[in-house]
Amino acid sequence: MSRKMLVTCALPYANGAIHLGHMLEHIQADIWVRFQRMRGNEIYFVCADDAHGTPIMLNAAKQGITPEQLIEKAKTDHVADFKGFNISFDNYHSTHSEENREITTEMYKKLRANGFIKSRVISQLFDPEKQMFLPDRFVKGTCPKCKAEDQYGDNCEVCASTYSPMDLINPRSAVSGATPIVKESEHFFFDLPSFEGMLKEWTRSGSLQSEITNKMQEWFESGLQQWDISRDAPYFGFPIPDAENKFFYVWLDAPIGYMASFKNLCDRTGLNFDEFWKKDSETELYHFIGKDIVYFHSLFWPAMLDGCELRKPTNVFAHGYVTVDGVKMSKSRGTFIQASTYLKHIDPECLRYYYAAKLNERIEDLDLSLEDFVQRVNSDIVNKLVNLASRNASFIAKRFEGKLADKLEDEALFAEFIAQSEQIAAHYENREFNKAIRLIMDLCDKANKYVDDKAPWVIAKQEGCDAQLQAVCSMGIELFRVLMSYLKPVLPQLAERAEAFLQTELTWDNIQQPLLGQNVAPFKSLFSRLEKKQIDAVIEETKALFAAQNKAEDKKGKQKVENTENTAVEPIAAEITIDDFAKLDLRVAKVISCEAVPESNKLLKFQLDLGDHQRQVLSGIKAAYNNPEELVGRFVIMVANLAPRKMKFGVSEGMILSAGTGGADLFLLSADEGIRPGMQVK
């Protein structure tokens, strides 16, 4: 019996471009959705832009446009990118929509009526210049525990301490630089602890990924907390009913955006919205997300739905991050590749196939090895799959006017290919795409071996063997048809071209029905080889793109410095003696490697050469150096006799010196030419 299903992807934030990391999730979901359609299931695939929040409000102001203009431009770009990669959404909407406002307001009122919304007065830091309350991440200052400078308002990335923004020493607004004041404000909280029993039961259902189940157990053990769902004006979002100058936090209305996008589709097509969202719905609901937002989708979202007496997700499918050549995507190396840049140079089906060949059901990072990318695409798609069709089609066209044989040359081999149908289907269903691809390519090898063993090019030279030639080549084309049917969810454009050649639609139901006695069209090139020069073009364009952005930012930074030359500087510290200074062992060090700490918003990890040994130093200057790889080879000054500090993200064996007020306004100290690693600063 046909299943009714609704599938979503995480909503891309409307404050930046789509990159190949985003595309992993959307390709994964699209393959699964296309497979379900081939199996005859009634499935709807929706998404939207996540269009609210302080970052969007501030970015729009920085650009001199309205938030509405910013998110409209982002949506246009995002839709074009997804279309370019053949992501087959039934609807792509925005959280800044009337449907989302109505559903968000309705759900909030329902939660409030059911007693799940609490309110209390909290103290917050307030920017007197911008006249706005400051979220934790928009406050910086000195850690009250370890005295590390330029730390965020909620936790220290040097000593891993957590604290209130009010505890920061010398706090400042990350928006204006002003010293914030403390103001009280009433906030609204979602009572998540009330749903602990339901969430534990949901966790024990056995359908969630084991990694999610284990993580949820950790959160249960540490204790669930009430969730602040409100933000004070000014804020770009939806106003909270009956609460002046209060707005819903972006993470409240973002997942509701799934419902809003589907509601928009229902209103246009006549679908029954309630059938998919009512508490006792027999339909299936699946969310594809990245591992970084499991917390919201496995705790807050199902609890909110349950509190509104709506259905919970059937499952949440999380995936890992994308790395390129074994390391985090890098702007300076040209591997932080935007979808639009990729599409200018490379067929999107290449990436769809490569991701599919590596994706499984676990939450694992996926490495895009550029050399392997080229090799695998050419080996599998061009040399094996497409070549299987081309080497047989030429004989059918020239010798038999495109007509295939009336019977199968090798019924046992055909039966072997058909027998794998349900196993391949099971791999697709379980999101084990790598296993499906491996099995399909094994069959492809068998098909090519069949043609090699039969050698139609030899048969073609033998008199009186036309029937045998037609039978062998028809068999080769028949096996190609079966393989393309299996690969249609992964390679929809190639499948469409194959359908034009075969003059039949590729469906799961007709896989076992051979094209006996039918005609095929004249063969045209189905797929082009992937060349290294195409990869190089993408890398170089990416480097140029971000180099231009950095140049523009540097220009703005210089103008800012020029405009603030006469502003006050920090006062000179208390006087010390020469003996105090002598306690510091300052050394010259050469940067061997430098990379961002993925889990940290502040830290860079340095490997430093001090002449006779090397050291690792973690430094909180990430905001000032967007391209840490460019620091390799540079000489810096460090405090060499500072006791090693065990931090959340590793051990730091010293301190690198820099000057500035903090954040992006930090500058590493360097030395003149001729300096050598290990030299002492005197």
From Swiss-Prot:
Motif 'KMSKS' region per UniProt: ranges: 328-332
Binding site for Zn(2+): 143, 146, 156, 159
tRNA-binding domain mapped to chain residues: 580-682
Keyword Cytoplasm: yes
Compartments where located: Cytoplasm
Required cofactor(s): Zn(2+)
InterPro entries assigned: aa-tRNA-synth_I_CS (IPR001412), Anticodon_Met (IPR041872), Met-tRNA-synth_bsu_C (IPR004495), Met-tRNA_ligase_1 (IPR023458), Met-tRNA_synth (IPR014758), Methionyl/Leucyl_tRNA_Synth (IPR015413), MetRS_core (IPR033911), MetRS_Zn (IPR029038)
Enzyme class at the top of the EC tree: ligase
Catalytic activity: tRNA(Met) + L-methionine + ATP = L-methionyl-tRNA(Met) + AMP + diphosphate
Binding site for ATP: 331
Short sequence motif 'HIGH' region: positions: 12-22
GO biological process terms on file: methionyl-tRNA aminoacylation
Subunit structure: Homodimer.
Family according to the record: Belongs to the class-I aminoacyl-tRNA synthetase family. MetG type 1 subfamily.
Function: Is required not only for elongation of protein synthesis but also for the initiation of all mRNA translation through initiator tRNA(fMet) aminoacylation.
Listed HAMAP family: Met_tRNA_synth_type1
Protein known as: Methionine--tRNA ligase
Organism: Actinobacillus pleuropneumoniae serotype 3 (strain JL03)
